[in-house]
Structure formats: structure tokens, C-alpha cells
Regions:
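Terminal amphipathic alpha-helical/low-complexity segments used for targeting or macromolecular assembly
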Residues: 1-84
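Conserved NTPase motor "head" modules and their coupling/switch loops across ABC/AAA+ ATPases, GTPases
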Residues: 85-89
Length: 170
């Protein structure tokens, strides 16, 4: 139960305990006082935290097979993604995902990302146009503003992808 630690495997939140662990870990990264989703968002950090909670709760309800709540949260997440242009599919990032600023972020559903990944605005992590391979991000990666990571590539642990980089070989 819980998550798989290998970055190339899918990440699953399959029980309430794992959901709480994810949210508590990410709450500390965002500097929030509690792990609850804010009802009224004031400031950029509130919107980002709300997105993070929606993403993780959607993962939980979909992975546990709760069709009603899974559908409700998928719709809620999709509306929030379209409103704020942050498109991160469920079950792609391990715990510790931190979005630095509101703005366009696009992630392919086949991407596998490890723990403690930071994403800046205007980033794309997508499959290449000529193959079906999607990037694999190891633990502790910071993706800079405007970076594009594409194709069948594996990024090492604890690196930073520079701002406005667009190279499939990074």
C-alpha cells in the first residue's frame, strides 16, 4: 500500500494514511499552518496550496475506487487546472511537489517524477513528437522558468534545469 519509491514507477496514494503523509510533507514545503484546503484564497500561495490539495485528494479518490468522489474531484481539479493553466495529471509526481508561482505548467501523463520536485512557471515536461517516451525525473529536481523537457530522457537526482532551456538531451 502507499507509494512506490522508484521514480520510473507510477506513484499511487492508496490509503488515507498515505494521503495525510503527502499533504503534511507538502504543507511544510509551502509553509502552511494546517493541511486543510483554504476556502477563500488570498495570495498566490493559497491558490497553489489549494491546487496541491485538489491534486492529491483526486489521486486518493481515483486510486481507492470511490467513483462518486473520484468524479467530483476530477471535475473540480479540471476546472481549477483550466482556470490557472496548471495541467499536472494525477499519479505523476511523488510527494514533495512544489509549484513556485501561478502560471502555465504542462506535464504529460506518462511522466514519472520522484520526490521534492519544484516547478516554476511556463514549464513543459512532455513526450517528444517522434516517439512515445516521456521524461523521468529523479528526486530533488528544480525546473526553471520557461524550461521544456521533452522526449525519452532521464534526469539525475538533485539537479536544476535552467531557465528557458529547450534541449531534449538536457
Amino acid at each position: 500500500m502507499g507509494t512506490k519509491n522508484n521514480s520510473s514507477d507510477k506513484v499511487y496514494i492508496t490509503d488515507k494514511k498515505t494521503l495525510k503523509e503527502f499533504l503534511e510533507y507538502e504543507r511544510q514545503k509551502y509553509g502552511r499552518k494546517n493541511a486543510r484546503m483554504p476556502l477563500i484564497c488570498i495570495g498566490e500561495r493559497s491558490y497553489l496550496w489549494k491546487y496541491n490539495v485538489l491534486l492529491r485528494k483526486t489521486e486518493y479518490y481515483v486510486n481507492t475506487g470511490n467513483k462518486l468522489m473520484g468524479t467530483i474531484y476530477r471535475i473540480w481539479l479540471a476546472r481549477y487546472q483550466n482556470k490557472h493553466h496548471i495541467h499536472i495529471p494525477i499519479n505523476t509526481f511523488d510527494r514533495g511537489l512544489k509549484i513556485m508561482h501561478l502560471g502555465p505548467i504542462l506535464v504529460n501523463g506518462n511522466v514519472r517524477a520522484g520526490k521534492d520536485i519544484s516547478l516554476h512557471i511556463n514549464t513543459s515536461i512532455v513526450a517528444g513528437g517522434t516517439n512515445n517516451g516521456a521524461p523521468v525525473l529523479e528526486d530533488g529536481i528544480v525546473v526553471g522558468v520557461g524550461a521544456v523537457i521533452l522526449g525519452n530522457i532521464r534526469l539525475a537526482k538533485n539537479i536544476a534545469v535552467g531557465a528557458n532551456i529547450m534541449d531534449p538531451r538536457v
